[in-house]
Design a protein with these regions (language model features):
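Conserved beta-strand scaffold positions in the cores of enzyme catalytic domains, especially
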Residues: 108-110, 124-125, 226-228, 262
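An acidic intrinsically disordered interaction segment
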Residues: 1-8, 100-108, 129-131, 135-137
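Hydrophobic helix-and-loop "lid/oligomerization" segment in the mid-to-C-terminal part
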Residues: 2-25, 33-61, 80-81, 157, ...
Length: 318
């Protein structure tokens, strides 16, 4: 993270009358938490704020209760103010139907921590060393001189605790930031449970079926191993995006595999693929080869074909 870029973003957001904040498609806690934290801070400074995400899927119920959610507007209701900020979107494509709102802005900015993000705004605050976008938003709020109260801190904590896997792969700076957010009033026990440890019973039935069909390919990744599971479209029926996405965090625990993959059938012959690695394999170029992106140890992409074909496509890339 460069303090100068955070300061530059803060200057751009000072004394502006209105701002549109865009979150990425299939929103998670980092993009929504970052968007709402920034939105609340700007609103308190007299700025007209709207926060939106491409509503191809509903907002997860765990995120709907975050402070500041009244700032959220439906994608079709977005005004599109002259100043637009994208939070946690690794590429313009991740804004999906709202990409045109971003490109039409008089002044556009991105705040993001994905290594695959090469920058697509007029001003880009991108730091792949940051554990989540929320910590970058915090740096901007500090430059703005915003008081971090319990509401803003809660939204930032949501992004931090989820993107670090409940701090399992957090950097030392993230623990210091977490302590600061807790001091500001975050109810860590409640929000950690809501965001990470809460599932409907039908999720257990889906997981049982998926894990029963998991496959290990020990020779993949030059002998480091791949474990993968397939979530058929019938199993996704009635499941939220976040519930299906959580499967990969179970699959990745297999000791015998460096890389884990979960193939989710979102439609006829269409798939989203979630990838995780433990230490040695950089997933960014693998995902990028399929038009996706993400982080070194957590990436994803979309593919088309039969289940056997999309698995074969991945194996060819490893």
């Amino acid at each position: 993270m460069t303090a100068s870029t955070s300061a530059a973003v803060a200057r751009e957001l000072t004394d502006v009358p209105a701002v549109t904040i865009l979150c990425h498609v299939r929103p998670d806690a980092d993009t929504i938490g970052s968007g709402l934290a920034l939105g609340m801070a700007l609103e308190r400074q007299g700025v007209d704020v709207e926060v939106a995400f491409p509503d191809t899927v509903a907002l997860p119920t765990t995120l709907a209760g975050l402070p500041g959610s009244t700032l959220l507007v439906s994608a079709h209701e977005v005004v599109g103010h002259p100043v637009v900020v994208s939070v946690d979107a690794a590429s313009l494509g991740r804004l999906d139907s709202l990409a045109t709102v971003f490109t039409a802005a008089e002044r556009s900015m991105t705040i993001d921590h994905h290594a695959s993000n090469s920058g697509f705004g007029d001003l880009d605050l991108i730091d792949a060393a940051a554990d989540c976008t929320a910590v970058l938003v915090l740096s901007v709020l500090d430059e703005l001189g915003v008081e971090i109260d319990d509401d803003i801190a809660t939204c930032l904590y949501a992004g931090l605790v989820t993107d670090t896997g409940s701090f399992r792969w957090a950097r030392p700076e993230s623990f210091r930031i977490a302590a600061r957010l807790l001091d500001a009033g975050v109810d860590a026990r409640t929000w950690s449970r809501n965001l990470l440890d809460s599932h409907p019973f039908r999720w257990f039935e889906m997981v049982a079926s998926v894990l029963g069909g998991a496959q290990l390919v020990p020779e993949a990744c030059q002998g480091d191993g791949l474990v993968y599971a397939i979530v058929g479209h019938d199993l996704l029926t009635g499941m939220s995006w976040e519930e299906s996405e959580s499967v990969v965090d179970i699959v990745r625990t297999a000791n015998e595999a460096e890389v884990a993959a979960v193939f989710k059938e979102t439609g006829p012959s269409t798939w989203t693929v979630s990838l995780r690695s433990k230490r040695r394999v950089d997933l960014v170029p693998i995902a990028a080869a399929h038009g996706g992106g993400g982080h070194r140890h957590a990436s994803g992409y979309s593919d088309a074909g039969t289940a056997d074909e999309v698995v074969a496509h991945l194996l060819e890339s490893l």
